[in-house]
């Protein structure tokens, strides 16, 4: 599953 940092990058 994607990491928290990846989530921020998507935003």
Swiss-Prot record:
Principal location class: secreted
Keyword Secreted: yes
InterPro entries reported for this sequence: Tachy_Neuro_lke_CS, Tachykinin_dom
Keywords, ordered alphabetically: Amidation, Neuropeptide, Neurotransmitter, Secreted
Pfam families listed in its UniProt record: Tachykinin
UniProt cross-references to PROSITE patterns, sorted A to Z: TACHYKININ
Gene Ontology CC entries for this record: extracellular region; synapse
One biological process term in Gene Ontology: chemical synaptic transmission
Domain of life, per lineage: Eukaryota
Entry-annotated residues carrying Methionine amide: 11
Cellular compartment(s): Secreted
Functional description taken from the UniProt entry: Tachykinins are active peptides which excite neurons, evoke behavioral responses, are potent vasodilators and secretagogues, and contract (directly or indirectly) many smooth muscles.
Family designation: Belongs to the tachykinin family.
Protein name in UniProt: Substance P
């Amino acid at each position: 599953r994607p990491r928290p940092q990846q989530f921020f990058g998507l935003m």
